[in-house]
Amino acid sequence: MKIEKAQADFERLINKHSFTVTARTIDSGIPVYHRVWNRENETLEIRILLSGEYPLMTVRRNGAPDPKFIRDYRNPKSAFDTIRKIITAAGFEM
């Protein structure tokens, strides 16, 4: 996948799913996007950025990192498919 296509796909999915910029990487200033889902006793936060053509994602549950989801994905669509599965499994809606 070309970087331009990955960037366009990533931006489209970020906007479609209401992610917002929360920070920028120190070394290169790449925006880090996030979205938080809340309910009474549970918080789920997903942070994602695009490094070249590869999305990098982390998941935090109740403020603690969930290490099994700190990884990169081959393209924006596969990252957002995984996000959808995580959100659904946790009982939230995308």
Q: What is each residue range found by the language model?
A:
Residues L49-A64:
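Short aromatic-glycine-(Arg/Gly/Cys) micro-motifs in beta-strand/loop hairpins
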Residues P76-I87:
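A short, charged, amphipathic alpha-helix used as a generic interaction element across diverse proteins
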Residues V32, E45, L56-T58:
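General beta-strand recognition
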Residues N41-S51:
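Broad, structure-driven detector of short, well-ordered beta-strand segments within folded domains
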Residues M1-R39, N62-K77, F92-M94:
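Negatively charged, low-complexity tracts enriched in Asp/Glu with abundant Ser/Thr
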Residues I46-I48, R71, I83-K85:
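Glycine-rich loops and low-complexity Gly/Arg-rich segments
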